[in-house]
Amino acid sequence: MTIQFNDETFRDDYTFRNSEWAIKRFPFPFHEDSYMYSVNMEQHKGGPEGSVYEKRFDVDEHYVSEMKDRARVLADDPLRCQSLPHMTLAGWDLLELIMVSKSEDYPDLFELHRDGNKWRWINKPLGIDDTFTFLDEATLPYGPMEYITRQAQGDYAVLDQRDDNLWMDAGMVTTQADWSLDFDIGMNFFEWHAPVPMAHEKGIFVRALKFLLNIQQGAPARRLNWTMTVNPLLDTSPENYHKWGIQKTTLTPENIGAKQHLRVELQTFFRLPRSNALVFPIRCYLCSFQDLMTVPKWGRRLHRVVRDLPVELATYKGFIDNRPLMLEYLEKFDDGLPTSPGIWPDLDTEPPLNK
C-alpha cells in the first residue's frame, strides 16, 4: 500500500498528528487576507497531483483511524446514520459511486469486481472482502448507505430533490461541526441553514440552492468551509457538546499552538443516477496552529483573517471568546509582508518570516 496509515486517536489522549506531507496538502480555505461568506462553488474536476482535490474521494494517512472513530460513534449513537424509506435507491447509488471511484482512483487499496448484479468489494486497509448482490439489501450487513459510509472518510448528507428544493432525507454524520442529523433529518435546504448569520441577508443560500439544483450527473462541484476546534476532535456534535464545549476553556498561551486546530470541510456535490438525489460529502481536515505556522503564507494570512472577521461570524464559528488568545499567538507569525493570491502554500516563492 502506498499510503502509510497513522495509528491515532481523535478523543481522550488525542494522538492525532499530521505528517509533513499532510500539512503541505492541507486544504487551507482562505484565498486572500480576509473572509466573508460566499457561494464559492467550483467544478470538482480534480486538482494538482497529490492535493486533496486530485481524486473524487480523498484517502489519506488518517483513513483507518477515522473509520475506527466512526464505528465508536455509531456504537454509542446509532441515530448518527439515518435514511428515510424512500432513500434506499439513493443509498445504492452512493455505494456504487464510492466503490467505483475508489477502485479506479486507488487500485492498490480497493478492488471492485462486477458480474451483472453479483459484486465483490475488497477494501485492503480495513481488511474487508465482501460479495453481495447489488440492489439486494439482504446480502449486506447494513443498508447500502451505511455499509459504504462506514468505509469512507467524511460525512454524507443524501439530499432528495423535489418541489424546487433539497431535503436532507438520509445521511451518515459523525464528524460534523456542531449540527445534528437527528435534528435536521427531513428538513429542506433553507431550514437546515437557518442558524447561519449574515449569509441569508446577502442572498447567498438562494444562489447556492439554484446552483445545486442544476448539478448534472458526471459534473460534480466543490467548495470549502471552515471553523475552529480545540483539540483534534472529529465528533463535535450538539449531542456531545457537554463533552467538547468545555475544552474551549483549556487554552493557554503555552498550549494554544498545539491544541487549537483549524477545521476545514471539503464539501463536494454529486448527482446520483437512478434516484436523481444529490449526495453532499463533507470531508473534515484538521491542522493545529503550530503546524499551519510552518507555512509562512498561511501564518500571515490566518492572523489577518481571524483579526478582521466580523463579530457575528466569529461568534457563529464558536471562537469569539478565544479570539484574543488566538491573535496573541498568531501575530508572532505575521510580519506584515504581502501574501500571494490563492490557497496554495507557495513554499518556493513566499518569503520566510521576517520578524
What does each model-identified segment do?
Residues 1-355:
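Extended, well-ordered protein cores
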